[in-house]
């Protein structure tokens, strides 16, 4: 069995992170994972709560009869002392959920910012000979979160970690994956090079914008994703479900929903993995076009971004199971079969 270290952070910072300035909506994921050779199912998310205890105005799937994924210890798996998880400042709530699923404590790490904006990272426990998993989406502010990830990787490499996996639930710059006109940069390839050169041995990402992004890395990439099963062309009188990898300003998906309503759709649902939610996304999504907007927590969702139609699902169990299988040298692809 390979050694693995999972770090999330007891974070010490000289300035508040973007997340600390507002309450983040969190909730338990409800998934079931079988053996490495059996498929996984994910059917439900538990009620959400805000970090300050207030009840957010976000509905959840309502069926208490659906299964809840048991902790690893209940399935005969004991935590491995060589597996460590660290979290950056971008999404510590998700990192904590992943650690809970794996039955681990987040690793101790110090992250702070100097007055000139430079980032300082120090691991506060040994990772020598360990499998280290660094959980840090490169969501907005993308440049700060990316640089923080690179410095975390470098710190682990210099501390003699055996393997370093960058767990990037949301991969920023993924849309810059090709040249659309002359003299443009392919930033997705550049970011892949930076992560590799910093010292990462592997990348774990959720629902990349395009499959070709995996080819930009010279190291193994585990791609966690969902898949469309069918498409119905005639929507008159039917329930329409719109799927996308991300919602940024929501302009495209709102126009699509308006078209579906004009074509006679009875209800329209929007589902996406990454909720970037740049203005005026919330205004468009809450305008009445959608019966429900279902997203995941690859990017932290702030309370001021909530609206009555919003449902947030957690990817913690899915990422946690993938992390364990990478560490255990088990099949990752069988999760999706």
Predicted regions and their residues:
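PRPP-associated nucleotide enzymes
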Residues: 1-337
């Amino acid at each position: 069995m390979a050694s693995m270290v999972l770090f999330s952070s007891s974070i010490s910072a000289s300035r508040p992170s973007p997340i600390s300035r507002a309450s983040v909506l969190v909730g338990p994921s409800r998934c079931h994972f079988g053996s490495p050779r059996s498929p996984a199912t994910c059917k439900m998310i538990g009620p959400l709560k805000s970090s300050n205890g207030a009840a957010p105005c976000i509905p959840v799937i309502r069926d208490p009869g659906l299964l809840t994924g048991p902790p690893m210890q209940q399935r005969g798996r004991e935590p491995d002392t060589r597996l460590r998880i660290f979290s950056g400042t971008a999404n510590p709530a998700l990192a904590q959920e992943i650690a809970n699923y794996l039955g681990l404590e987040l690793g101790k790490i110090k992250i702070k910012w100097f007055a000139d904006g430079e980032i300082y990272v120090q691991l506060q426990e040994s990772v020598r000979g360990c499998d280290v998993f660094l959980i840090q989406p490169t969501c907005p502010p993308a440049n700060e979160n990316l640089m923080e990830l690179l410095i975390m990787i470098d710190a682990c490499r210099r501390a003699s970690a055996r393997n370093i996996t960058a767990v990037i639930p949301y991969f920023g710059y993924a849309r810059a994956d090709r040249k659309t006109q002359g003299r443009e940069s392919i930033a997705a390839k550049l970011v892949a090079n930076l992560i590799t050169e910093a010292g990462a041995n592997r990348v774990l990402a959720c629902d990349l914008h395009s499959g070709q992004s995996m080819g930009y890395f010279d190291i193994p990439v585990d791609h966690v994703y969902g898949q469309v099963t069918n498409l119905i062309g005639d929507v008159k009188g039917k329930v329409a479900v719109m799927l996308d990898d991300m919602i940024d300003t929501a302009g495209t998906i709102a126009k699509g929903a308006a078209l579906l309503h004009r074509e006679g759709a009875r209800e329209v649902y929007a589902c996406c993995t990454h909720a970037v939610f740049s203005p005026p996304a919330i205004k468009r999504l809450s305008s009445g076009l959608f019966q429900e907007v279902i997203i995941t927590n690859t990017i932290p969702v702030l309370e001021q971004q909530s609206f009555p139609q919003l449902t947030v699902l957690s990817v913690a169990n899915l990422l946690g199971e993938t992390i364990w299988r990478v560490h255990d040298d088990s099949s990752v692809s069988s999760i999706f079969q």
